[in-house]
Design a protein with these regions (language model features):
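Catalytic core of the metallo-beta-lactamase
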Residues: 5-16, 113-169
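Active-site-proximal loop/helix segment associated with metal-binding centers of metalloenzymes
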Residues: 25-29, 34-35, 124-144, 154, ...
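Active-site HxH/HxHxD metal-binding segment of metal-dependent hydrolases
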Residues: 42-112, 388
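Metallo-beta-lactamase
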Residues: 85-146, 248, 255, 266-268
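Cap/insert and terminal regions of metallo-dependent hydrolase folds
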Residues: 159-260
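Feature captures hydrophobic
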Residues: 266, 273-393
Length: 393
């Protein structure tokens, strides 16, 4: 069995019985705010061809850095069998059917599914509110000899259930941040420093708990961090020592693994890991060049950014422009939702100011009303580029 990293949480798993393509993400996500790091737009031709012809497709969950809809439409046959997590809702299946996929292999949460000839998979799902739309999932793959756990960014609550399938050779695991907290909050610098440090520490602590519980032969840092090439967001990359960033790179996680004598594998898109009596790692470039990506990260990111600045400019021209009825549209959309959610309104307990460019909108949670802001008291404030609000609406 071998696993080739293709960027972020993307993994191409090859066994003698067939291949599984996991979470391929290539197009910048979230309105161009997230890019794959290290970049994966330069895979060699052989690998680029192979990942377009998998025997199975696995999409862990609905987030844009895992479900790259445009790439799937452009590159993967809709006849490819999809390994479907056992979510309580059908949202992921509906999205994939909308893209043209028709062959789904339904799984039961945590139960091994025999794909034939000693190839088996099990998908473990999590469905708490923090797991996002429809939930999140982790994949266990066994070829009868070796076993991989692709936990990606799934916060698995029952780690014993993952381990119950047998000893683990490779554990793919998120360790870095994947949200904008706390950087986008309005906090004094000292408080922001405290919040950022606490967030990074908690991320590492959670990842190390998973590492100790699963006790794999090797741990592969996965599912982040992304990088930020938009000039307005570039400062959120973990470059300067005093930056307010929750996105440490692999080298810092590897250092933590080394400190407790765990085998961590640094990787970039194209890194191939082959399982046998030994674990063999082959990078697509020289080891020194791999290390340079992280040791000279700012230079690497600036070069990467230069290739996408025009793309970013063009992408922003596609955002919806100002319309005269944004307030009315939001009022008609949100007030019925507020009426359906009295417990939520009580929980929020205050009004929220939405500042969309020069338009100020008050979302009055206690009274379930959306109206123009008239200098009333409010408990929360969001400042969002109006073009983004218009585009989402």
């Amino acid at each position: 069995m071998r696993a080739t990293l293709i960027g972020h949480a993307g993994i191409f798993i090859e066994t003698r019985q067939g291949s599984i393509l996991c979470d391929p993400w290539f197009n910048p996500a979230y309105f161009g705010s997230w890019f794959v790091f290290p970049r994966n737009d330069q895979l060699n031709a052989e690998l680029a061809k192979a990942i377009r012809q998998p025997n199975y497709l696995y999409i862990s969950h609905l987030h844009g850095d895992h479900l790259d809809e445009q790439w799937l439409v452009d590159n993967i046959s809709p006849q490819t069998p999809v390994l479907l997590p056992d979510y309580p809702t059908k949202e992921l299946e509906r999205r994939l059917r909308h893209l043209g996929f028709t062959h789904f292999i339904a799984t039961s949460d945590g139960i091994a599914c025999d794909l034939g000839d000693d190839l088996s998979i099990a998908i473990h799902v999590e469905t708490s509110i923090t797991d996002g739309p429809a939930g999140d999932s982790a994949l266990v793959v066994s070829d009868g000899v070796h076993r991989i756990v692709n936990q990606n960014d799934c916060r698995t609550s029952d780690l014993g259930a993952l381990l119950a399938h047998g000893p683990i050779d490779l554990h793919f695991l998120q360790y870095s941040g994947a949200i904008w907290y706390p950087m986008v909050y309005d906090e004094p610098a000292q408080r922001m420093r405290e919040l950022v440090d606490l967030k990074v520490e908690s991320q590492f602590a959670r990842a190390m708990r998973y590492v100790e519980a699963l006790n794999a032969r090797a741990i592969v840092p996965s599912a982040g961090p992304p990088c930020f090439l938009d000039p307005e967001l570039f400062a959120f990359n973990d470059i300067a020592k005093d930056s307010f960033s929750i996105f440490p790179d692999q080298t810092k996680f590897i250092a933590q693994l080394n400190a407790v004598q765990r085998h961590g594998i640094i990787n970039i898109p194209g890194t191939c890991i082959t399982l046998g009596d030994d674990i063999k790692v082959l990078h697509p470039i020289a080891e020194a060049d791999v290390q340079a990506i992280f040791s000279d990260k700012e230079s690497y990111l600036r070069n990467y950014q230069s290739d996408y600045l025009l793309w970013l400019e063009d992408m922003k021209t596609t955002w919806s422009q100002e319309s005269p009825d944004l307030l009315t549209t939001l009022k008609l959309w949100w007030e019925p939702l507020l009426a359906m959610a009295p417990a939520l309104r009580r929980g929020v307990g205050a009004a929220c100011l939405l500042r969309a460019g020069d338009l100020d909108i008050l979302i009055d949670f206690p009274n379930g009303e959306v109206r123009p802001f008239n200098n009333e008291a409010y408990g929360f404030r969001f400042e969002i580029d109006r073009r983004l609000v218009e585009t989402v609406v």
